[in-house]
């Protein structure tokens, strides 16, 4: 999908780029698959802030996406390719032979009019979903489950893909986009292919207002704050913070490991970032 630039009639347009949405076939979503998205502004029920940098943004409705791909043995035709404001990838509306309609993530190469299938007997074709035990080693997959039947939790953002490296007993070895190699139960579902909208990572936001449309508020550095607001705050004039980087709550950051989940350590074969 090509990226367009703008004639710099304002300073922000000089650096701003955007996707050419020539792959989108309709701007009218399927209403039965829309639900209202309640916005919190980063605040909990008591009204105090729990997530910084959240708030504002354009109103959105959630599209109900089929992450389980559990409609086995029923062929579905791709009716439309649509924009989804809640994710980086495009979504495809699938019209099944029994009349039901569902949204799925659009993989690279999936076009309107194509037919897809889910289930152990499905062919190894882009958009088809199968258990990992039925997928040959070396295949590129996305939309991967961590627990059978729970629905996909990994490899769902634009341009993402994992590679099925091998199968050992009850587990399949997957090379994830982060570089991590992980064991996943062999009965978990995965979809063939790479998630679409691969040029998403090449878009330049260009201006602060475009992030505000998304509901992302400004991020201030700790050294610009007062001591009451951040451990790096205060000092006479510009300072370096005077200590190693920490979060606003005093925990070391920038490379400091905080992961503490021994229960799933056994499933990680190679950590991300390591050869």
From Swiss-Prot:
Keyword check for rRNA-binding: yes
Which biological process annotations from GO are given for this protein? cytoplasmic translation
> Which top-rank group of organisms is this from?
Bacteria
A cellular component term from Gene Ontology for this protein is: large ribosomal subunit
The record's section on Pfam families has: Ribosomal_L2, Ribosomal_L2_C
> Looking at the record, which segments are called Disordered?
212-259
| PROSITE patterns named among the record's database cross-references | RIBOSOMAL_L2
SMART domains found in the cross-reference section? Ribosomal_L2, Ribosomal_L2_C
Q: What GO molecular functions are on record for this protein?
A: rRNA binding; structural constituent of ribosome; transferase activity
Q: Which InterPro entries match?
A: NA-bd_OB-fold (IPR012340), Rib_uL2_dom2 (IPR014722), Ribosomal_uL2 (IPR002171), Ribosomal_uL2_bac/org-type (IPR005880), Ribosomal_uL2_C (IPR022669), Ribosomal_uL2_CS (IPR022671), Ribosomal_uL2_dom3 (IPR014726), Ribosomal_uL2_RNA-bd_dom (IPR022666)
UniProt keywords, alphabetically = Ribonucleoprotein, Ribosomal protein, RNA-binding, rRNA-binding
| PANTHER family reported for this sequence | LARGE RIBOSOMAL SUBUNIT PROTEIN UL2M, RIBOSOMAL PROTEIN L2
* Task of the protein: One of the primary rRNA binding proteins. Required for association of the 30S and 50S subunits to form the 70S ribosome, for tRNA binding and peptide bond formation. It has been suggested to have peptidyltransferase activity; this is somewhat controversial. Makes several contacts with the 16S rRNA in the 70S ribosome.
Q: How is the quaternary structure described?
A: Part of the 50S ribosomal subunit. Forms a bridge to the 30S subunit in the 70S ribosome.
Q: Which family does it belong to?
A: Belongs to the universal ribosomal protein uL2 family.
- Which protein, by its recorded name, is this? Large ribosomal subunit protein uL2
